[in-house]
């Protein structure tokens, strides 16, 4: 699948999606951008004990997240849930 065939969000956008786990990281299926998924950046940097608690809290839920980085050539989208929670 070619990423540039689909529209991607911009850094700073707030988007909504459903959280799921893949390869010990949390990803979000984006409702507004079909065929796109984003990775929760903070889930990659966490210690395993904290990650398990975070995973149990979020997997399967629909959440709003803030886009922190987008690689338009590769189609990678990094989002942050914690930054979104601070602004609410």
UniProtKB/Swiss-Prot annotation:
Coiled-coil features, chain-numbered ranges: none
Keyword Transit peptide among record annotations: no
Boundaries of every S1 motif domain copy: 8-82
InterPro entries hit by this protein: K3-like_poxvir, NA-bd_OB-fold, S1_domain
Oligomer and partners: Interacts with host EIF2AK2/PKR kinase.
Similarity comment text for this entry: Belongs to the orthopoxvirus OPG041 family.
Protein name (database record): Protein K3
Organism: Vaccinia virus (strain Copenhagen) (VACV)
Gene assigned in the entry: OPG041
